């Protein structure tokens, strides 16, 4: 029958054969326990009901048995007290099982030893199935191999819900009961779904697999069919010689599961189990039950109720060891392969539990609770087990329980084995594979998605670089413009006169337009171009070069400037040009690049007046005008005039180039200068007067000075139109007229300025104009602040070139300026 059944049921048949081979052996030794078990559990009647339940209403059977007998027995007994399937009390069983299971099977080993071995090796105590349940399972399996799987699922569910869920689970101490109970427990929990259980065939396979797994193949026994046959032989053999087989703790343990297996397989793989049941099942089952009860009592189901004593000692080891033995966690073992002996027990419930167990916290807990029986332990059992097993089992079970909880949620226990082979391995595997594929796809797609972004990021730097370059270029242009403006401003008299001489920018500005209009409208326009050209002069050469370059240096504005410059250079000779230009030249020389610019600028406004040596008033006015022009034309540059004034400071350094220029200028200058001096003194005076009138008193005093002073005045004139401010400062600092004067800013210029500005505001104005003010903690206009920064810059720059400052500005001919102005 068994084989026939097993053939139809496939894995079940093999299992049965295996059981027949292996289990029958144990049946001989174990037969007594089954009767005792049956007697205890209501061997006759309970079995009958169990069988019916097994056959069709196993669910009902289990529930019926579970509610009444199983619950109390479970609670009362430390071992599985109820049949896994029918949940009948295992009182009789226990007596037999404890003695038979432990003694018969464990005769070789101490009763405790077997449970420990089982616990450690099998990792789960065997679940007990009453003979009635076994028979019913056999019948069920025979009648409905698949149906029984469902029935088992249901019966387990019912068991779980009925007895296992209640006391049965608590009483799941009895291995069978526990197995059933865990199943039913889960059912009771409502976590266990008949659907969640593997088909009877599959379950029996799993059960067998757990049995064989009990032999340790269970862990890896992925195929229930192979394992079942193997398991039963091993399992049953171990069952009847379970304690003898404890070495094969899985086997020894399996014997306990074997009963469970038979019961569940009876349910699932009725053929194998029935086969075992008739021959070995009854004996095996009882024997195992007896043996298992001890083991179970020790480790599995009493965890909460009866087994609390056993469980703590045995159950703990079982649970703890079993999980490892199972391969991972007890739940895993039970569920995973049912492979572990522990799993065998759970497999019936576990295989129903496979998913349930893995999903059902109860199942996990049960597994842990009774190791092998853990699955059978219902969640209640879990709780009980937690109590019975306490720290050991509970801790393990807690992990298992958490796993079980996850299992309930459709997740499976975390054990390695369960992950791959455990509860509903195929489904799980498929799910896991699908998830893995999804994740892989996500990662791949994510990486693909990220790649464009990364590429875009890579591309971004180019755009950013362009942006940065454009920004820097614009900033550079701004800086250039700023420098130009600063230079122009430095030379524009407006701010210089206002800052250094105290002249109102307006006054200076007014003269500037006036002089520009009268003397050189083009000059004023040139002045602005000069400002624009500031960079060009800066980039050009030294003032000398500037002089030479003036004609040769072509720059949009510089071309104009240079055209003026050549005239300017030519005009150097003219005294008027010399005087204003000397100042310009000095300053320009002081700051070679700046001086070029300044030359152009100042000459533009001032040169016209300089160009007219005969016209003193005109030069004066023009001189005045230059500063107004610069200031009016470039008030902001006026700010920078202070900066330029600084540059004037810097200009001393340039002055050496200026000196070079100066010599040539000097060559021209002496005669022109003197001639200009002759006219210039008056002119300077007049200019000074005019300048004073328009710009302030500053020009007057200085301008009234000697011809040299006039020359310097001319220079200063340039300065006071171009650097009114700087000039006074220089004058103050460098009152003694001398290009070598310490203030390299405008030593040459400084002389004339000193004379004039000294009288006016020389000391204070010069310092104010050329020396950067302390800007820390001082509130000042942004423009002023820029001017101060520029002054500081010029001062620092001037230091570098001061050595060049030794220029005889007196010899410098301002005619250059005049031509520039004429320009």
Curated annotation (Swiss-Prot):
Residues 26-36 have a biased composition (Pro residues). Residues 422-484 form a coiled coil. Residues 382-393 have a biased composition (Acidic residues). Residues 516-526, 641-657 have a biased composition (Polar residues). It is found in: Cytoplasm; Nucleus. Residues 52-64 have a biased composition (Basic and acidic residues). The keyword Ligase does not apply. The modification Phosphoserine is found at residues 694, 706, 813. It holds the Pfam family FAM193_C. Transmembrane segments: none annotated. GO terms for cellular component: cytoplasm; nucleus. Disulfide bonds: none annotated. The keyword Heme does not apply. Residues 1-78, 158-191, 209-281, 381-409, 503-583, 599-775 are annotated as: Disordered. Keywords: Coiled coil, Cytoplasm, Nucleus, Phosphoprotein. Residues 168-184, 263-281 have a biased composition (Low complexity). Belongs to the FAM193 family. This is Protein FAM193B. The gene is FAM193B.
